[in-house]
Amino acid sequence: MIKQNKMKKYILPALKLTLVLVILCSVLYPLLIAVVGRLTPGQGKGETVLVNGKVVGYTLIGQKFSDDKYFWSRPSAAGYNAAGSSGSNKGPSNPDYLKDVQAHIDTFLAHNPGVRKDEIPAELVTYSGSGLDPDLSPAGAKIQVKRIAVVRKLSADKLYILVDNYTEKPLLGIFGPAKVNVLKLNLALDNLQ
């Protein structure tokens, strides 16, 4: 009898705590996140980019731009597939990874005459952790300006100003790097014509 009382003393509180945590973690927390998501711009579905009332992309999901008249995005190991978002999972000493990086370097140099290998920002030739980065550094965008200026027959100075205008500063001036959203930049580029 004494053993049963001791078991009740320990098991009942453990079961109660388990039930409380299941309700908290499986019901209340997801509901709270869903409500907060609905209060954000885009209502938790992501910030859509519209052109003439049509969705052309999302600000937080990178897209492939490979035409010389556009700023190129960062390479994607996931093929820009949002459902299969992932990095390459290959380390910097992996021979396959090194081949991929070299292929990206060769492609970039072939399309950007006058640029030296050591001038290319790493983000333009390496995969990101998510495979869907929508942003580049200002340097990653500016190194592409000459190619785009030639193809579109625009002034390079005009394009440098465009990049500067679309550069988002770090949050509160200290959190994170300056960045340029490639989709927004390319849409603004189309409006220059």
What are these regions (language model features)?
Residues N5-K6, P13, S26, L31-V151, ...:
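Flexible, solvent-exposed loop/hinge segments and secondary-structure transition points
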Residues M1-I2:
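N-terminal amphipathic/basic-hydrophobic helices that include classical n-h-c signal peptides
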Residues R147-Q193:
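Extracytoplasmic/periplasmic C-terminal soluble domains
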